[in-house]
Amino acid sequence: MAHYAIGDIQGCFDELTALLGKIGFNHGTDTLWLTGDIVNRGPKSLETLQFCIRHENSVQIVLGNHDLHLLAVGYGEGAPKRSDTIEPILKHPDGRKMLDWLRAQPLLIREGNRVMVHAGILPQWRITKAESLAGEAEAELRGKKYVKFFSKMYGNKPAAWDEGLEGYARLRFIVNAFTRMRALTFKNELDFDYKSTVKKMPLYLRPWFKAPDRQNLDHTIIFGHWSSLGYTNADNVISLDTGALWGGQLTAVNLETEEITQVQAAGGIDWKSFTK
């Protein structure tokens, strides 16, 4: 029995199939974590989502920002974008069932000392706190007012965490931290503009996992989202988005041995044309 994690797929289903074949993944004995953004911009978002649903006994996902975008558009509260490849899902006879399945997926998964989220965990949040906050947003997603949640989800404010945050401002920050975070100011404020490499990062910013006051170093955090960061295994984090969508690689890591396996993506789209 092996336990693997794979980075952002974004509809690159052929690469996922090739990678699973390369590692010899067995749905009967092995387990697979996916770091979110399973859909959108790649050519086979529908097939990727169907795969996750079909194999939900062996495959676990966390929600990424593109998955949430699909849900917002699907429930009538988000505007489609030129780069979207989610229309086949929305037009499928089982589209609503697939959306409802996706809406029930978590923002955070923990198993022992390993935690998976899409983008990261705010430095000042201990893992137990992060689990609790993820639960707040998940309850809203699964509750009766989920459509209103999607109408309030978008936005970059508030930029900083405050325990006194309430209502949709609180939920928006929680979702942004788990699904959109890359760089932080030295006051741990979210910066959504910077998307390039750590090496090129302005001096007033730092990666979320480099904050000196991190309260979650007692767990290994597995995440994706930041394709410019690439594969990273340091500071008790494993970053797995290696830019399959952009013509890079799709990466799997064996979580027991930390051995990585990659497949080269076919083609890719021009990353300069869009913002992730």
From Swiss-Prot:
Reaction(s) catalysed (UniProt annotation): P(1),P(4)-bis(5'-adenosyl) tetraphosphate + H2O = 2 ADP + 2 H(+)
First-tier enzyme category under EC: hydrolase
GO terms, molecular function: bis(5'-nucleosyl)-tetraphosphatase (symmetrical) activity
EC code: 3.6.1.41
InterPro entries tied to this protein: ApaH (IPR004617), Calcineurin-like_PHP_ApaH (IPR004843), Metallo-depent_PP-like (IPR029052)
UniProt keyword annotations, A-Z: Hydrolase
Disulfide bonds: none
NCBIfam families linked: apaH, PRK00166.1
Family the entry assigns: Belongs to the Ap4A hydrolase family.
PANTHER family reported in the protein's UniProt record: CYTOCHROME C5, PTHR40942
Protein's job: Hydrolyzes diadenosine 5',5'''-P1,P4-tetraphosphate to yield ADP.
Protein's name according to its UniProt entry: Bis(5'-nucleosyl)-tetraphosphatase, symmetrical
Organism listed in the record: Neisseria meningitidis serogroup A / serotype 4A (strain DSM 15465 / Z2491)
Underlying gene: apaH
